[in-house]
């Protein structure tokens, strides 16, 4: 699927939902233009906030032959370029920023979704067989199964036999869920309903792994299960969300190749609203073809 197809899907889904169709971006931000970022700086300072835009735009190459080229390169990407060297080693500020980003990623994995968050969103909360974060990180197999209490809650409080069941889970990034939820779930649910699909009761699974959607789909009798789960964070990027969609999942027979994945959903990747439109189109095609993953025809 190329960019033009994605844009057409977004326009058609947003229009059917009665929302404003995204307008073409201004020339300054069209393809070929340089992304906006803080002005590059070459000053090394221990007082600089290592998570700030200024620190990310820092240029560590001393006495460059073509400073304008480095400035242009630094403005064009969020990658770790132009950091310079001190002999064979990285500059102090480059190393400190690397360590800070690594620490931020570890914090994201270890953080918990606040208990009040699910209540504030009006979501039913269930959990896997996992009881705490340490067990979640060391026993991924238990994160693939619902607790007995969760199974009872789904059977008593959720719509049975829906066309599409949407599930939200913290996964390995709490920030991915809390930062993107309001921009992806409401338009996703609205788009699915606008498409005439029977949508199940959305709910939140604490300590869930991707394969838990197989058990959920089997219990609820869902034709399509869509799992929105936090991705393992990268350095300096802790808000990336993934969508795993599967048709008619079964615990015993569904394999990873049966899933269709849309990853890198965040403001610096695929915008959540755009991802919602693409997921709606994906769910419709899954129901039409009665397939997902590698079994779908393009």
UniProtKB/Swiss-Prot annotation:
Predominant place of localization: other
EC category name: lyase
Catalyzed chemical reaction(s): ethanolamine = acetaldehyde + NH4(+)
Residues annotated to bind adenosylcob(III)alamin: 210, 231, 261
Localization per Swiss-Prot or TrEMBL: Bacterial microcompartment
Cofactor binding, note field: Binds between the large and small subunits.
Gene3D superfamilies reported in the protein's UniProt record: 6.10.140.690, 6.10.250.2060, Ethanolamine ammonia-lyase light chain (EutC)
Protein origin, superkingdom: Bacteria
Gene Ontology process terms (BP): amino acid metabolic process; ethanolamine catabolic process
Leader sequence segment: none
Pathway(s) the chain acts in: Amine and polyamine degradation; ethanolamine degradation
Cofactor: adenosylcob(III)alamin
Molecular function GO terms recorded: cobalamin binding; ethanolamine ammonia-lyase activity
Keywords: Bacterial microcompartment, Cobalamin, Cobalt, Lyase
UniProt GO cellular component terms: ethanolamine ammonia-lyase complex; ethanolamine degradation polyhedral organelle
Pfam families documented for this protein: EutC
EC number, UniProt record: 4.3.1.7
Function description: Catalyzes the deamination of various vicinal amino-alcohols to oxo compounds. Allows this organism to utilize ethanolamine as the sole source of nitrogen and carbon in the presence of external vitamin B12.
Annotated family: Belongs to the EutC family.
Assembly description: The basic unit is a heterodimer which dimerizes to form tetramers. The heterotetramers trimerize; 6 large subunits form a core ring with 6 small subunits projecting outwards.
Protein name as annotated: Ethanolamine ammonia-lyase small subunit
Lineage of source species: Bacteria, Pseudomonadati, Pseudomonadota, Gammaproteobacteria, Enterobacterales
